[in-house]
């Protein structure tokens, strides 16, 4: 433990916070090109085939991004917009693709949570 004089001379060193989404370069979103679209299985208590895409961002970073929602039209060479946000049961997947922007279509006929999946407002009768 430092003495009072040592604290006056040097002060305390602030802890550096690690950046969890370094690939985005402090931007809210980044555009990228899909290199591969694949399915992986989640961690232990869960069971599914989760859809992810390997994306090369405009700053040349290669990342894995989760494709949310049921069904998608994404394939190799599709242009997608990527935001931060990890998927808790998929290790190494720290980004989400944004639906309804660029080549990744929104989900048709979705009524609830439409803004998260790029869905159009349903026509009222």
Curated annotation (Swiss-Prot):
Its main location: mitochondrion. Pfam families: Ribosom_S12_S23. It is found in: Mitochondrion. SUPFAM superfamilies: Nucleic acid-binding proteins. GO terms for cellular component: mitochondrion; small ribosomal subunit. One of its GO terms (molecular function) is structural constituent of ribosome. GO terms for biological process: translation. Keywords: Mitochondrion, Ribonucleoprotein, Ribosomal protein. Signal peptide: none annotated. The keyword Glycoprotein does not apply. InterPro entries: NA-bd_OB-fold (IPR012340), Ribosomal_uS12 (IPR006032), Ribosomal_uS12_bac (IPR005679). Protein S12 is involved in the translation initiation step. Belongs to the universal ribosomal protein uS12 family. NCBIfam families: rpsL_bact (TIGR00981). This is Small ribosomal subunit protein uS12m. The lineage of its organism: Eukaryota, Viridiplantae, Streptophyta, Embryophyta, Tracheophyta.
């Amino acid at each position: 433990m430092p003495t009072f004089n040592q604290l006056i001379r040097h002060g305390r060193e602030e802890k550096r916070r690690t950046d969890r989404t370094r690939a985005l370069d402090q931007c809210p979103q980044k555009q990228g090109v899909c290199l591969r679209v694949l399915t992986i299985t989640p961690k232990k208590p869960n069971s599914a085939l989760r859809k992810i895409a390997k994306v090369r961002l405009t700053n040349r970073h290669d990342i894995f991004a989760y494709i949310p929602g049921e069904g998608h039209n994404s394939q190799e060479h599709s242009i997608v917009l990527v935001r931060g946000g990890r998927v808790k049961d998929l290790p190494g997947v720290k980004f989400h693709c944004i639906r309804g922007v660029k080549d990744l279509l929104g989900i048709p006929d979705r009524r609830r949570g439409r803004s998260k999946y790029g869905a159009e407002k349903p026509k009222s009768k």
